[in-house]
From Swiss-Prot:
SUPFAM superfamilies: Subunit IX of photosystem I reaction centre, PsaJ. It is found in: Plastid, Chloroplast thylakoid membrane. One of its GO terms (biological process) is photosynthesis. It is a single-pass membrane protein. Belongs to the PsaJ family. This is Photosystem I reaction center subunit IX. InterPro entries: PSI_PsaJ, PSI_PsaJ_sf. The keyword Nucleus does not apply. Gene3D superfamilies: Single helix bin.
Amino acid sequence: MDNFKKYLSTAPVLLTVWLSITASGIMIINRLYPDPLIFPI
């Protein structure tokens, strides 16, 4: 279990998780507001 925690804390794994979360958020925003040029601010 200790080796698994060390594996999860490595940079490529953290980068993959972070990029997946960011991409999911962008896809959700893009689905709700498909045209960012007319984004209601």
